């Protein structure tokens, strides 16, 4: 009974967060400092930043920061002790941000962006859904891809450059 009650509370809380996502306030944002701020929330050795160049992206800094935190946390949880890689590049007026992990991969990729679907015990199933909503509301895209260089997942965010 307690487990069902806790699951129902997670569901209600998740639904409320999905329903009240504020409209983004996009503006030019320097990506390197935003990424550094997100990385600081985790053990430094667990996140390898593979890009040194700074680019500007047109985004809501607070919302994009939350997306980065969510994707980094997912990667770290999936990869066990393996570090997560974070990198970005700019090309043709678009900025691509990639976060790669060394976890088991994509078990059921068709459901990953379905609200309340989760592969984690105790998960609410809203993190990826919220992340995609945030990115798409800012004119971008978010996709999860199987890594080509071994096991794991690569989250790819594409947003307009500033």
Predicted regions and their residues:
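Detector for a conserved hydrophobic position within an alpha-helical segment of the HATPase_c
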Residues: 135-136
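Short conserved segment of the HATPase_c
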Residues: 106-116
């Amino acid at each position: 009974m307690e487990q069902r009650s806790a699951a129902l509370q997670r569901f209600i809380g998740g639904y409320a967060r999905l329903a009240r996502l504020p409209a983004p306030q996009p503006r030019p944002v320097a990506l390197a400092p935003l990424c550094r701020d997100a990385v600081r929330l985790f053990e430094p050795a667990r996140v390898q930043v593979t890009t040194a160049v700074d680019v500007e992206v047109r985004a809501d800094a607070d919302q994009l920061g939350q997306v980065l935190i969510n994707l980094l946390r997912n990667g770290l949880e999936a990869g066990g002790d393996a570090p997560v890689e974070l990198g970005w590049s700019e090309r043709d007026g678009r900025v691509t941000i990639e976060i790669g992990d060394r976890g088991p991969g994509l078990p059921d990729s068709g459901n990953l962006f379905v609200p309340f679907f989760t592969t984690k015990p105790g998960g609410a199933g809203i993190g990826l859904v919220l992340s995609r909503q945030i990115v798409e509301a800012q004119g971008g895209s978010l996709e999860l891809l199987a890594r080509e260089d071994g096991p794991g997942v690569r989250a790819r965010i594409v947003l307009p450059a500033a």
